[in-house]
Amino acid sequence: MDNNNNNNTFSSLDNVMTNQNPLLMDFIPSREDSTSFSTMLPWNTIRSDPLQMGGFDIFNSMLTNKYLSSSPRSIDVQDNRNVEFMAPPPHPPPLHPLDHLRHYDDSSNNMWGFEANSEFQAFSGVVGPSEPMMSTFGEEDFPFLISNKRNNELSLSLASDVSDECSEISLCAATRLASEQASCSSKDISNNVVTQGFSQLIFGSKYLHSVQEILSHFAAYSLDYSSRGTESGAASSAFTSRFENITEFLDGDSNNSEAGFGSTFQRRALEAKKTHLLDLLQMVDDRYSHCVDEIHTVISAFHAATELDPQLHTRFALQTVSFLYKNLRERICKKIISMGSVLERGKDKTQETSMFHQHCLLQQLKRKNHQIWRPQRGLPEKSVSVLRNWMFQNFLHPYPKDSEKHLLAIRSGLTRSQVSNWFINARVRLWKPMIEEMYAEMNKRKLNNSHIQPNGPTLRMPKSVMMSQAMHK
């Protein structure tokens, strides 16, 4: 069976090599179809005359040099009529007519320009009808090795079987993928080491607890604002539009105010605008005072509920509100002063009157120009009024019990310690002088009655009243 296959193979090769020249010329690579022949033939078998390519010389030299003199392992005749050629790297003849058709590297004596340390692959020629050839190399590296011929034409393949080609392709891809994964894994390991060291440094810091507490407060505020976002959307848009209107009003064209003061209408318009600015300034002052009172009330309520220091929570709010208030107030003041100076140009007044008017205006504008973030001394007026009302309602027993202190702290927004301290001070500063004054008035009336009725009964003065009178004397 093997002998028959060998005879068929060599007979088919004999038929091909003894055919006419046009069919065999397709066996020679060209620039238009350089991939139709990719086997490496010994250059010493090709003569300088290209017309002798169609004779028996090339076939006899090929059989003599390659097939008959090689070992049995170099000739592999298979059932699918594939013949493998194992050729060492040949030395090309000088100035061959086909030198321009082949890829040759003179420095390495390599026909196709391969690297010097690379080995030649086994090339197999397929005679007869075949499928389009698949190459184990990439198109970008060796585009001339790929052949896509029509049926019933001669086509050459780089491997003996499609499965071998696929296995080689998959092996190359797996090798490349493994190298890329190894490089990526080394980078990931280095990044993980740096991240773990940084996390250990953070968890070992002594400021970790404080930073976590501050971040928890900010997160709570963010959640609160997000929950109230839908409710405050309309209010924030209204405030933004109102602030834009104020800005446009303040940044109005000054040329309109300086030009054409001869007319009375423009002067009246400027005076009305100045009056409007003064009202706006007063409204800003009132709103700011109300906002600060509300902030202090919230501080007191928070301190009463949690017994924690609220300065951490209110510092940013007070500074932000104070900054916005000072900025808006300064702009309004500058606009009013500029309008006043422009109006003074159109009036026939003396220098003393104008200086006095500006001085009074500046004094009015600087009425609340102080450090806003300075802590307020004393308790809020609202809380003090609640405590004072309770003291007058319980005038005979002005010091509250523990349960009453708790209720008063909730109503006034203060802590229990603040309520206790206020009643201690109020009992000394308010209640005791009032009691002494009441007893003095009663004794005075009794003395007046004793002069009228000498034998009438006398009241005994309290010891505290007697001591206070002695101290006054």
UniProtKB/Swiss-Prot annotation:
Keyword terms of this UniProt record: DNA-binding, Homeobox, Nucleus, Transcription, Transcription regulation
Q: Which GO terms describe its cellular component?
A: nucleus
Q: Does the keyword NAD apply?
A: no
Question: Which residues lie within the region annotated SR/KY domain?
Answer: 205-221
Task: Give the GO terms filed under biological process for this record.
Answer: floral organ abscission; meristem maintenance; negative regulation of cell population proliferation; photomorphogenesis; regulation of gibberellin biosynthetic process; shoot organ boundary specification; vegetative to reproductive phase transition of meristem
Tissue pattern of expression reads: Most abundant in flowers.
Q: What is its main location?
A: nucleus
Compartment list: Nucleus
Induction cue: By light. In etiolated seedlings, maximally expressed after 3 days of illumination.
Task: Look up the DNA-binding region in the UniProt entry and give its residue ranges.
Answer: 372-434
Q: Which family does it belong to?
A: Belongs to the TALE/BELL homeobox family.
Q: What does this protein do?
A: Transcription factor which may be involved in the signal transduction pathway downstream of the COP1 gene. Controls floral competency as a specific activator of FLC expression. Is responsive of the nuclear import of SHOOT MERISTEMLESS (STM).
What's this protein's name? Homeobox protein ATH1
In its UniProt entry, the species of origin is given as Arabidopsis thaliana
